[in-house]
Amino acid sequence: MAKKPALSPQEFRSEALATALTTIERKHGQGAVMRLEDSAHVKIPAIPTGSIGLDLALGIGGIPKGRITEIYGPESSGKTTLALHIIAESQKLGGTAAFIDAEHALDVNYARRLGVNTPEMLISQPDFGEQALDIADLLVRSGAVDVVVIDSVAALIPQAELEGEMGETQVGGQARLMSHAMRKLTGTIHKSQTSVIFINQIRMKIGMTGYGSPETTTGGNALKFYASVRLDIRRIQTLKDKEETYGSRCRVKVVKNKVAPPFREALFDILYGTGVSREGELIDMGVEAGIVDKSGAWFAFGSERLGQGRDNVRAFLQEHTDIRDQIEGKLREHLGFAEYVPPPSPEVMEEEDGM
């Protein structure tokens, strides 16, 4: 009987690996471990943010699905507005969204004006932090929700602290709560391909001396580590018409990004009552890309003169949605974004509100 040829070290390693992979799949199911080239999830799906500039800065066209995103910044900087725009974009794509309002401060009428289909949005106003995170966990595990927003981490009060007396300290209670929640949620979020957004506030570090930022976010360090994307949103300018304030200029910095290069920035206007100004962004980015021509204070698109002054051009594009959609289509094509689907006209939205 012929002797079986001896295996080379490399062949022995390959055979041992194949045996291990077979055992793992038999024990934990197909797909428990795979080669990267066999994975169907190399391209990370995303939900648009409602801002073309921010979609570009994020590198994948929006916030990643199946990951945790943190949006933080000072008060009245546009954190909740940005989160509501993401919900609206998710709903336009046919998704289901949930808003966990731990602050008990959601303005439903404002959300509707931003384009959120409020009758279809799930909302919860929990009494304490454990309840809020348990609701988020159950929604994610269902696999039927596309985006879950928790507003905000600072309002996730541990039950022990809530039941204690006023002024009684619970050292590290919120940090422990968030650390446990992150460990429990991360794997489920990836499997269900749900985008979970935590809105957070900033605090000043006590006794900060020397170098480094004096600011920090609430809830400990767990969220910083587990979040795939962290967005720092700041109001950098107040928009005024003579003496009347009508909005603010905001800068969003991608301070952490595990799915694309980080530290990119986006600038856009947030107008009071209407949210992120799509038209203002189209003007700025259109001029930068050479799609909109700017000569002095005059703006033009091809042979069409749009007007004099940025505010007048923005008003013109709000009225002439066909021209606005043409500019956006060309801009998205220039940036290499997916096919543009125009949002419903204000008339259609008014009819739906009246139903």
UniProtKB/Swiss-Prot annotation:
GO CC terms: cytosol
Amino-acid positions noted as binding ATP in the UniProt annotation, renumbered to this chain: 73-80
Domain of life: Bacteria
Main location: cytoplasm
InterPro entries recorded: AAA+_ATPase (IPR003593), DNA_recomb/repair_RecA (IPR013765), DNA_recomb/repair_RecA_CS (IPR020584), P-loop_NTPase (IPR027417), RecA-like_C (IPR049261), RecA-like_N (IPR049428), RecA_ATP-bd (IPR020588), RecA_C_sf (IPR023400)
GO annotation (BP), single: DNA recombination
GO molecular function, one term: ATP binding
Localization: Cytoplasm
Keywords: ATP-binding, Cytoplasm, DNA damage, DNA recombination, DNA repair, DNA-binding, Nucleotide-binding, SOS response
Function: Can catalyze the hydrolysis of ATP in the presence of single-stranded DNA, the ATP-dependent uptake of single-stranded DNA by duplex DNA, and the ATP-dependent hybridization of homologous single-stranded DNAs. It interacts with LexA causing its activation and leading to its autocatalytic cleavage.
Protein family (similarity comment): Belongs to the RecA family.
Name of the protein described by the UniProt record: Protein RecA
Taxonomic source organism: Solidesulfovibrio magneticus (strain ATCC 700980 / DSM 13731 / RS-1) (Desulfovibrio magneticus)
Origin organism lineage: Bacteria, Pseudomonadati, Thermodesulfobacteriota, Desulfovibrionia, Desulfovibrionales
